[in-house]
Design a protein with these regions (language model features):
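Structural beta-sheet core signal
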Residues: 1, 54, 77, 111-113
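P-loop/Walker-type NTP enzyme "switch/lid" segment
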Residues: 1-62, 151-152
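Conserved nucleotide-binding/hydrolysis micro-motifs of P-loop NTPases
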Residues: 6-8, 83-84, 116-119, 146
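Inter-motif core of Ras-like GTPase G domains
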Residues: 47-48, 63-83
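Conserved C-terminal guanine-recognition region of P-loop GTPase G domains, centered on the G4
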Residues: 87-107, 114
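Beta-strand-loop-alpha "switch" segments that mediate conformational coupling across diverse proteins
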Residues: 117-118, 127-158
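C-terminal boundary of histidine-terminating zinc-finger modules
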Residues: 151-171
Length: 177
């Protein structure tokens, strides 16, 4: 898990993770190392790594965005049901599609509706927006206390000994994608 977001939420989530859960290697990429190591060395992951998730801050653009796009296999963008997030997502999608890093080597891109309360005006607007894109709208993730609990203990939904079946069902389209 490579965390480029200065907020450090991903790194904090991992710090809360207990040793009995599967280990996840973390790189705090938002920190600049002062001990005279190269950036490449700082971002190095173990050789047996099979999957990498890159967490970027909202609003990343320009050369930084292009660099991230060159180092990824796919782009997954969570969007919450708010007019502000919908506008930000519109700009981000435009930036991705016009980025040299994407135009040189296009990658699969998809969106998910995140922290959703169904049957609300905000969700209806978000769903209409996501369905209007020429980009796959993979799934809708509900806003539940299960995610609050998971975040507190550095867990994912599938780490619970008795995960909520509805939560698992919501994640399945994303896993299949």
């Amino acid at each position: 898990l490579i965390d480029h977001d200065p907020q450090g939420s991903s790194a904090q989530w991992l710090d809360a993770r207990t040793k009995n859960l599967p280990s996840i290697y973390s790189v705090a990429a938002y920190r600049k190392d002062d001990n005279h190591t190269t950036r490449s060395f700082q971002l190095m992951v173990p050789i047996d790594t099979t999957h990498i998730i890159i967490d970027t801050p909202a609003g990343v653009s320009g050369n930084v965005l292009s660099d991230h796009l060159r180092h990824c296999d796919l782009i997954l963008m969570p969007v919450v049901p708010s007019v502000i997030d919908i506008r930000a997502a519109t700009g981000f999608i435009k930036d991705v599609l016009l980025s040299p890093g994407f135009r040189i080597k296009p990658k699969p891109i998809a969106v998910i509706a995140n922290r959703v309360k169904r049957n609300t005006l905000g969700y209806n607007k978000l769903e209409a927006f996501l369905n209007s894109l020429n980009i796959p709208f993979i799934t809708t993730i509900r806003d539940t206390q299960q995610y609050v609990r998971a975040a507190e203990f550095g867990m994912g939904i599938f780490d619970f000994t008795q995960p909520n079946e509805k939560d698992r069902e919501e994640w399945q389209p994303l896993i299949n994608w």
